Amino acid sequence: MKKITLILCSLFFIPTFAQDHFSGITTSKRVGILNASLNPSELSNLDSKFEVQLMSFSLNVANNKIGFSDIANGNNLENRVFDSAGPVSFNVDADFLLPGVAFKLLNWGFAVTTAGHIKTSVVDFDPNVGEAFINGALNSISSGSTKIPYINNQRITAATWGELGFSASHKIFENEKNIIHGGVTLKLLFPGSYANIGAGNFQGTFTTNTTSGPDFGKIILSNANADINIAYTGGLANSFSNTSDYTNSLFGNLNGMAADLGINYQLKGAGKSYKLKIGAAVKNIGSMTFKGDDNYSKNYKLEIKDPEQLIVNEFVGASGVKDIEQKFLNSGFLYNPETKKEFKVKLPTVLNLYADVKVISKLNVTLYLQQKMNADSANDQITSQNIFSVTPRVSLGFFEAYLPIGVNEISGTTAGLGFRLGGFFLGSNSILTAVTNDSKQADFYTGFRFGFL
């Protein structure tokens, strides 16, 4: 398990994997395929009759423990994760928007898009449990004991999958002052790989062994109970601490469907511009099924009754989910396995709401809200985040600059900067807070698309 935490910590050194992907550019005044990824109804508002997307990607990491000051001061990141109060949350993910095309025809807009997704999350992980199982130490009382009554389901999970999307948008209503569009995207899902370790209703006592012998000084767990879920498939079964574990299995076989539904309203301004645009969309309604030879989802009961004890240090250095499962099985404390060879995983369904207001000529301000629709605690749920942002932007036709200021439920307040030059864009949701404050998020996104006619 130590390898898993080390890779998450090391990712914080570079701008990597985000949940609020392409913040600022998805509500650009130059409407294109990226806008439709936020809300499919935007396809009817395409700036050009045809648009081709070559490739775009967004990478970010958000956490609630490690700040840039910890890196600058040379702190031990692995220890810093677990040495403070409150559960640990990490969110590491990447979006790859692969080649796609969109076009307008009469009052319709259409698009065919492809995308790949990589996501790793640590959800509500108790720091005492992490310090014991991952570092082989006690968090608070090095020579005493730590009792854990933790009801929440704490998880370490990772997933990769690909998408092929077919989108359509239509003008529903228009008069002299108002216009309304509606749209839908149907997505074919290609699940790549998945891994999950969940421990719900965890209760137990961690103690430093003071009895002389080969286990002297090691951490032991006693009087413990928990509901354990262990699931794995594909390349993430043996390890999810290497980049190749994800990229080698980004697209699997077709085995799922999902949908995005959206609507937008515009209060017309002069020419083709608007005074106000309001949009709403529900994204990622659906699930995908993982199946294969090396494919399992197992629910266990962990029971350690007095005077039995589990030597926790045996788990330090575990490389992957199967390795962790085997160590638990070797201990003899896992009971009543409920096994599935095929299992469904729910996509991170979210509600997107936004309003773009024209302040003066060339200056707009966008308000954006992302609200997750499902709890992250379920073992079959790919995680998401609640986000609110305010983005002032200057639009000069060929050139656009914007400043996204957001609040993220994991990493807190962030401020970034981005620009668009024709079809090329580059930005970050957190670059300003990264260089001026103790930010707990780092990210980067870029891409290129072009339109004609």
Tell where the protein language model's regions lie, with residue ranges.
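Bacterial Sec-dependent N-terminal signal peptides
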Residues: 1-23, 355
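Subset of outer-membrane beta-barrel
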Residues: 19-453
